[in-house]
Every structure is written in C-alpha cells, then in structure tokens.
Amino acid sequence: MPAAGKMVQIYVNANQAYQTIDGFGVNINSKQWQPRLLPAMELLLDDLGATLYRLDIFGKSNWPDPAGTIGTASLDLARMDAIYRGDIACRGWEMMRYLNKRGIEPYLTASGDVPTWMLAPDGKTLVDYERFSEMMVSLVDWAIHREGLKIRCFGPLNETDIGSPEGPSVTPEEYPKILEILDRKLTEKGINIPLVVPEQSQFNGNTICLIAAHPSLVKRIGVFATHCYADISLAQFDEVRAAASPFPDAHLWMGEYGDLDQSGEKEWYVAWVMTLRLLDMLENGYHGALVWDAYDNYHDHDEHWTIYGLLRTGLRAYTPKKRYHASKQVFRFVRPGFQRLLAEVSMPEVRALAFASPDQTQVVLIGVNQSSQPRNLNIWLEGFPEVVTRGKMAYYRTSESENCHRIAEIPVRGGNWPFSGIDVLVPGDSIFTLNFEG
C-alpha cells in the first residue's frame, strides 16, 4: 500500500524580497539557422519560455584568419566586411533578427581559439590584447550599426581559465587589462553595451575579484557570469558573491549550466540534478541562468557533436527531452522582473522557492520533493493582495513519468487549519510548480 506521506508547512512572505530575475534561457549555435529550425525556436520561445539567448556566431574566435597565416592584415576593413557579409555571419544576423522580432535582445558571445598570431610562443596564451579587442569590437559594431540589431550584452571571452579549445588562456591578473582595452575601443565607437565576464570554467571568485578591483570598469560590466556542471557548495557561492560585491549593479548569471553526461541513458537523472542546481543558484542570489545547450548539435570550438541540448535533434524534428520539461517548470512561470521572496519550509527534504511580480498580483512557487515518499504540502501566502488570496493556483509537475503536466487547480485559501493554505500532495522524487492563474 502506498505511504500516506507527511505534512510539510511552507510559509511565503511577500514583504521580504531578494533578487530580481533577469530571465532564463539557452546557449544557442546560430550556424544551425535555417527554415527547419523555426519549430525548435518556437518551442524555446513560446512553450519553454526562454528569454535569455547566449548566441555564438562563429564557434571559434579566429574568424578573420582561421589558419593563422595572414596575420594582422586579416583585420583589414575590406576583409572583415566580406566575412560579416558571408554565409556564417548572415546566419547569426538572421537568428538575432528573428529574436528581435520576437521581443528578445540576445546576448552575443564569442568563444574558442583565436588566430595563432595573437598568442604567446606557447601557442595558448593571449598576448595581443589590442588586436584581439579590435576584432571583438568589429563584431559588435557590425551587428549594431550595420545590421541594426538590438543586443542586450556582449561576452568577449570564454573559459580562459582552462584555455584551448574553449578560448585562449588568460590569467586572472591579465583579464582586467583586456577589458580596459575593450572598454576604450567600444567607447571610441560610441557603443554603450554591457559586458558579460568572465564566463570561467572553475566556479570561484579569482577572476571576478580582480576585475572588481578596477573601478574604471564599473559602468561597463553588466553581468558577472559563471559556469556550473557539478554541485556547488555554499562556501563557493559566498566567495563569488563577495568577489562581485564592489560592482553592486552587475548581476550574477550562470552563463552555462547543465550536466556533462553524454551517454543519453540518464535523462531523468540529468533533468533532476539540473533542477537542483538551478534552485541552488536562485537561492544564492543569481538573477539569470542559461542551459547548455538549446539543442543537440555540432560545436566548432571542440569539433564534436554533443547531446547536451534541451531538444533532441532528429532528421526532420526537434523533440523535447526530460531536461526540457524540468526546465520548463521554472522558465515558463518565473518571468523577467519577478522577485524572489522568503519561503520557509518545515522539512529539508522538500525545497521550495517563491517568486512574485513587482505588484505581487502574480505569484509562483517552484520546488522539489527529494523524498521517495509523497508529501502533503500546506502553503501559506502572507502579505499578498486579495486578488491572490481569493484566487487559485495551477499545479504543474514533472517526474520520471510526467512532463510538466497540469495536475489540478487549487484554492490559495483552504477550509480550516492545518489545511488553511494551498493544500497539495506532491509525490516522491518530483518537481512541482504552483502558478497563480486567477
């Protein structure tokens, strides 16, 4: 006979707010842009609810001189014009134009190896900061001034702590020097775009704290972004927050997160751990997070086909995986501009986070039941307007056998104590969302 479960009390206080959410989204490869990709884009936008798109056009940062044989002459304006009018670049411009039409300003990024003549004799370490910055600024300048695209922010470097093939090697001490040159060259072009940095592989504050020691960069840095493919400790989160604190207006994003399983045989496990990691980020003050990857595809930077995508890529179709449905439990309902609120849970095996719109007429709870047994939740909402307390919550759930299924509508106020709040039964090992729908 199934277990009856235990009662778990959850208290949400509308008067105690934390960070504002910038959004959730995906890393996306624009080389795949073609008409048959449109159904996948529509899924990401209209069903998943992704609003952040970290878009890489070339896959490598050596686009002026892939073979490294031309040298500095490869940055000649005529040559760069030809590259930016070429097929690969045009796929990027068209994907961004499509996103702009859908109300999205993408996060333009660059990753992978740079031209070899920009490197030290070791063939790994970036040393020609001036020409590297010239190359990066030319990309942003073309996108904004020649293509007329709206771009939210720009990320010039990727995982410089591990280097090739993810990007050139740059020490934490040298990183701010590159940013100062980029800032100068962007300013000379009249480009007031925020930078996203440092996008490091290792989760620590080593590079962030050195960037934040340069007050001249405070107006240029819009986001401090980190990467996550494993569980992160509270001490690590504390370190990153402390490192970023001198730049209070720079938000924290997880520029890449997911799991590195490539077997394709652990999809429910991957969906589960990705959700727990996302909750960790949000509990620790992150304003946004982007899954690696939007869909299964070939990546130029490491020259491999990968299956990290939320969507499985088929011959003529893109199919949502379990990790897509788990992500949807958060992405679709917690919208940009929502604030995280205090949510206290009486048992540690149930995790719950609460979010509300600025006027608090929309409220969302997301969580997981980490127990293998069902739990009876009673959720009390304190300090919300009457339009909420007299309304109902839609209950959505993802489990090993469910895919963000709509389970029920539940009144915000119950009949009597101890069932006076939102009264919901959550099975073991499941992800749940309660979304106010009037």
Regions found by a protein language model. Name each.
Residues 20-28, 49-59, 105-110, 152-156, ...:
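Structural recognition of the beta-strand scaffold that forms the well-ordered cores
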Residues 382-405:
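Solvent-exposed beta-hairpin/edge-strand motifs
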Residues 413-438:
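C-terminal beta-strand-rich structural cap/linker in extracellular carbohydrate-active enzymes
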Residues 11-15, 47-217:
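Substrate-binding cleft and catalytic face of glycoside hydrolase catalytic domains
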Residues 141, 168-275, 284:
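Noncatalytic carbohydrate-binding groove/subsite architecture in carbohydrate-active enzymes
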Residues 251-329, 341-348:
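Aromatic/acidic polysaccharide-binding cleft in carbohydrate-active enzymes
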Residues 346-386, 429:
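Carbohydrate-binding surface patches
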Residues 1-43:
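N-terminal module-boundary/linker segments of secreted carbohydrate-active enzymes
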